[in-house]
């Protein structure tokens, strides 16, 4: 059987979800403690990149785009990630701050989806995080004009070596085009795989100063 024949069998690829359910008694009054518990369990399970999340934004024509970004902080104010401010996602968020995040913890048969609005972080927050990064990562932030077209990888590697030489003494300065966003928590949905495709879904939705919690059909 050829590779193409194998690929044509994808309609038959499936498995049962058997790792447990999510019941109302398992829920917390607000979504953050449950998210924190699930994230800790994802870390304890040694999942690859447990803080990786799909970030979805929309351009001026209504075309959605997605990419994987790492969560770097979260609290009651929202979820934080950092990026090049000249990137496609940053331009999208300037025009339309609506955003969706998705944490796909496949091995635990779980996912968490967050929807809200993104706002730029303060310079103080960005500087503090930037200088906590490995030095080579700080230099790497200077190298790439994110999402621009380049002729070859060698262009990036040459620029990296040039800047590494330039910044060999003292601190690497924060690029003016590098920053971060905080995503407000307006809706948070928890999904747990269930047997016979009877998955458990609970939606937390802002309701004044509190949260409304609904079970959703799978």
Swiss-Prot record:
<dbReference type="InterPro" id="IPR000659">
    <property type="entry name" value="Pyridox_Oxase"/>
</dbReference>
<comment type="similarity">
    <text>Belongs to the pyridoxamine 5'-phosphate oxidase family.</text>
</comment>
<comment type="pathway">
    <text>Cofactor metabolism; pyridoxal 5'-phosphate salvage; pyridoxal 5'-phosphate from pyridoxamine 5'-phosphate: step 1/1.</text>
</comment>
<feature type="binding site">
    <location>
        <begin position="146"/>
        <end position="147"/>
    </location>
    <ligand>
        <name>FMN</name>
    </ligand>
</feature>
<feature type="binding site">
    <location>
        <position position="72"/>
    </location>
    <ligand>
        <name>substrate</name>
    </ligand>
</feature>
<dbReference type="Pfam" id="PF10590">
    <property type="entry name" value="PNP_phzG_C"/>
</dbReference>
<dbReference type="GO" id="GO:0010181">
    <property type="term" value="F:FMN binding"/>
</dbReference>
<feature type="binding site">
    <location>
        <position position="111"/>
    </location>
    <ligand>
        <name>FMN</name>
    </ligand>
</feature>
<dbReference type="InterPro" id="IPR011576">
    <property type="entry name" value="Pyridox_Oxase_N"/>
</dbReference>
<feature type="binding site">
    <location>
        <position position="133"/>
    </location>
    <ligand>
        <name>substrate</name>
    </ligand>
</feature>
<feature type="binding site">
    <location>
        <position position="88"/>
    </location>
    <ligand>
        <name>FMN</name>
    </ligand>
</feature>
<keyword id="KW-0285">Flavoprotein</keyword>
<feature type="binding site">
    <location>
        <position position="191"/>
    </location>
    <ligand>
        <name>FMN</name>
    </ligand>
</feature>
<feature type="binding site">
    <location>
        <position position="129"/>
    </location>
    <ligand>
        <name>substrate</name>
    </ligand>
</feature>
<keyword id="KW-0560">Oxidoreductase</keyword>
<comment type="subunit">
    <text>Homodimer.</text>
</comment>
<comment type="function">
    <text>Catalyzes the oxidation of either pyridoxine 5'-phosphate (PNP) or pyridoxamine 5'-phosphate (PMP) into pyridoxal 5'-phosphate (PLP).</text>
</comment>
<dbReference type="InterPro" id="IPR019576">
    <property type="entry name" value="Pyridoxamine_oxidase_dimer_C"/>
</dbReference>
<dbReference type="GO" id="GO:0008615">
    <property type="term" value="P:pyridoxine biosynthetic process"/>
</dbReference>
<dbReference type="Pfam" id="PF01243">
    <property type="entry name" value="PNPOx_N"/>
</dbReference>
<keyword id="KW-0664">Pyridoxine biosynthesis</keyword>
<feature type="binding site">
    <location>
        <position position="137"/>
    </location>
    <ligand>
        <name>substrate</name>
    </ligand>
</feature>
<protein>
    <recommendedName>
        <fullName>Pyridoxine/pyridoxamine 5'-phosphate oxidase</fullName>
        <ecNumber>1.4.3.5</ecNumber>
    </recommendedName>
</protein>
<comment type="pathway">
    <text>Cofactor metabolism; pyridoxal 5'-phosphate salvage; pyridoxal 5'-phosphate from pyridoxine 5'-phosphate: step 1/1.</text>
</comment>
<feature type="binding site">
    <location>
        <begin position="197"/>
        <end position="199"/>
    </location>
    <ligand>
        <name>substrate</name>
    </ligand>
</feature>
<feature type="binding site">
    <location>
        <position position="201"/>
    </location>
    <ligand>
        <name>FMN</name>
    </ligand>
</feature>
<feature type="binding site">
    <location>
        <position position="89"/>
    </location>
    <ligand>
        <name>FMN</name>
    </ligand>
</feature>
<feature type="binding site">
    <location>
        <begin position="14"/>
        <end position="17"/>
    </location>
    <ligand>
        <name>substrate</name>
    </ligand>
</feature>
<feature type="binding site">
    <location>
        <begin position="67"/>
        <end position="72"/>
    </location>
    <ligand>
        <name>FMN</name>
    </ligand>
</feature>
<dbReference type="InterPro" id="IPR019740">
    <property type="entry name" value="Pyridox_Oxase_CS"/>
</dbReference>
<keyword id="KW-0288">FMN</keyword>
<dbReference type="InterPro" id="IPR012349">
    <property type="entry name" value="Split_barrel_FMN-bd"/>
</dbReference>
<dbReference type="GO" id="GO:0004733">
    <property type="term" value="F:pyridoxamine phosphate oxidase activity"/>
</dbReference>
<feature type="binding site">
    <location>
        <begin position="82"/>
        <end position="83"/>
    </location>
    <ligand>
        <name>FMN</name>
    </ligand>
</feature>
């Amino acid at each position: 059987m050829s590779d193409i024949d194998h690929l044509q069998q994808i309609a038959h690829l499936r498995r049962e979800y058997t790792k447990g359910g999510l019941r109302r008694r398992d829920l917390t009054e607000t979504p953050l403690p449950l998210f924190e518990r699930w994230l800790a369990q994802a870390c304890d399970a040694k999942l690859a990149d447990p803080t990786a999340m799909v970030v979805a934004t929309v351009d001026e024509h209504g075309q959605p785009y997605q990419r994987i970004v790492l969560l770097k902080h979260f609290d009651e104010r929202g979820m934080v990630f950092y990026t090049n401010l000249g990137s496609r996602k940053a331009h999208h968020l300037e025009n339309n701050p609506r955003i969706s995040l998705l944490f796909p913890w496949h091995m635990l048969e779980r996912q968490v989806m967050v929807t809200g609005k993104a706002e730029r972080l303060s310079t103080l927050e960005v500087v503090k995080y930037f200088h906590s990064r490995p030095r080579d990562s700080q230099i790497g932030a200077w190298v790439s004009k994110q999402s621009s077209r380049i002729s070859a990888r060698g262009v990036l590697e040459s620029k990296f070596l040039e800047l590494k030489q330039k910044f060999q003494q003292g601190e690497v300065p924060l690029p003016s085009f590098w920053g971060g966003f905080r995503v407000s928590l307006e809706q948070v949905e928890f999904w747990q795989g269930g047997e016979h495709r009877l998955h458990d879904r609970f939606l937390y939705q802002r309701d004044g100063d509190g949260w409304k919690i609904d079970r959703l059909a799978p």
